[in-house]
Amino acid sequence: MKILLATDGSKYAQKALDFIVMHPKLLDVQAELLVIHVQIPLPTGFNLIMGFDRALELHDIEAKKIFAPVKKFLEKNAVKYRCLSAIGPIVKEIVDAAKNEHVHLILMGTHGRDLVGRALMGSVAQRVVANSTVPVLLVK
């Protein structure tokens, strides 16, 4: 089984990591865990002021910051993984990565956003569920 775990470094994403470790049957000998972190692009003005290379460097620094505790946690628990970093619309990048990597399951944390917030904005998790062609497991 190939699993794509989306992380943003939040405590909700950590709960998804905890879930993987607590359910070792998901990660059998042939399983592959891909961990993705998606960042929204810096506004165009920032790219023009600081330069495209510097903007990419800032994205890389942020990705390393997010992945560091994830890597430590997975290695401590002897979980094999591969990290993916993307820049773009979060939902699209997660769904595209699932398709391009031929994953069987997307795993992500969520949180109890209030009814008004859901109605006005929706959540990344809800939109991934709506747009994904593979099952999505949300961990609360």
Locations of the language-model features?
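Small/aliphatic-rich secondary-structure junction motif
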Residues: 2-50, 77
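Active-site-adjacent beta-strand anchor residues
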Residues: 6, 84, 109
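Gly/Ser-rich helix-loop-strand patches that form or flank binding pockets
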Residues: 96-140
